[in-house]
Amino acid sequence: MADNDSISVRISEDCPPEIQRMLTAAWAHDVDTVKKLIDTPEVARGQDPKTGESPLHAAIRSCGAPSEDDTPEDHEKAKATVSELLMWGAIWNDVDNNNETPGCVAARLNRPELYELCVNAGVRAEMLFGLMDGYEALDSDDEDDEEMAEGEEAQAEDGEEAPELVAAEEATQTAEEETPAVFQPPAVNLEEQVTSDKYLRSTVAYSDGKLVDDAGNGVMMAWETDIMRRSVDALLPNKEPGKRILNIGFGMGIIDGMFAETKPAVHHIIEAHPEVLEYISTPESKFDSTWEESGPAPGAYRVWEGKWQQIGLQLLEEGHVYDAIYFDTFGEDYGQLRMFFTEYIPGLLDSNGIFGFFNGLGADRQICYDVYTKVAEMHLADAGLDVEWKEIPVDMKELAEADKDGWEGVKRRYWTLDTYRLPVCTFLG
């Protein structure tokens, strides 16, 4: 076991006693003690204030890499400990000071069964969040709180309860001074979230084989070309001319250029960013007004300007149907993709059509990618869609070479994995 994976390193001197006891029991796979110590989910989620070690991290890390000394009993005790912690609400994607989740540790140590337990916990959590999405949380007795506050103010005005208010302030100050240190995740996880609205208000630049916004976020990059080519091959298996195609998100125009080569009967593009639309209007993009006028019929080749949420409704109302649909937007979370294939695809995709999307869900971390693959598959099935995942190798060594990868000037790499899972979706049955 590496020195930085030892218990003496992972449990710091500043670790509160109750968390230290829990980490030690989890490390030893002492399930009975773990059960005795856990009385609330918070106990299962406690982290060392310096290392970020959680009981889940500890239970997995202590296994080390597989060796001849491993016994079936040791393995079962480790699985039982991890399962118990997850049952009590241990968080599958909490990171430590090495920016590793418990699943990341399991993958690094080549512990596939423990890794799978973390993946399944992630799937359960994300499916639960999906069920809760759209429901407004109940207020926590706001009116009662206001009434109590008003009562306290009235008593203070009478002068009878003022000393208690002073005492309360002193107690609060003392409590703040005694508040134990809380682990702060690595800065890489504290970056500002990019939203669709922020992106649409941003300035973008096309340069050196990439499209980047003014915050340095990579919107699209040339390394995706092979993925786009394979996506076109999957959406249009025989490259037959005369197909009806819809693409959401123009980006650099990589996939639209490939679609255009097949000489479709209908080729519609939805794009919302003003500066991307300005670029499209130039001859350099190859999708300006000249391209629109080259269609086999008026409106057959068209760039729809606006958000897909509104344009999609218009297409549905006008009865448009497509043989191939591709979805690749920027700054939107998984919920928007799910809404598209749940509410829009049933009406826009031909019964024999094929739907695909850029699968970058959680692609900066393997366990997140694995979790979202399973979650998306379940939600696609709920929407009446079957999905086949085509695995495409990504040469990360080549991408890592500074003179080849084109990542210079990009704030964060949104892709770090060796394999891309390309989704090919068709209607069930």
UniProtKB/Swiss-Prot annotation:
Keyword S-adenosyl-L-methionine belongs to the record: yes
Localization, UniProt: Cytoplasm; Nucleus
Residues annotated for S-adenosyl-L-methionine binding in this entry: 199, 228, 250-255, 271-273, 308-309, 328
Entry keyword annotation includes Protein biosynthesis: no
Gene3D superfamilies: Ankyrin repeat-containing domain, Vaccinia Virus protein VP39
Domain RMT2: 190-429
Bias-annotated ranges (Low complexity): 164-174
Annotated region (Disordered), positions in chain: 41-76, 137-180
Molecular function via GO: protein arginine N5-methyltransferase activity
EC identifiers of the protein: 2.1.1.-
A cellular component term, taken from the record's GO annotations: nucleus
Subunit structure: Monomer.
Function: S-adenosyl-L-methionine-dependent protein-arginine N-methyltransferase that methylates the delta-nitrogen atom of arginine residues to form N5-methylarginine (type IV) in target proteins. Monomethylates ribosomal protein L12.
Name recorded for this polypeptide: Protein arginine N-methyltransferase 2
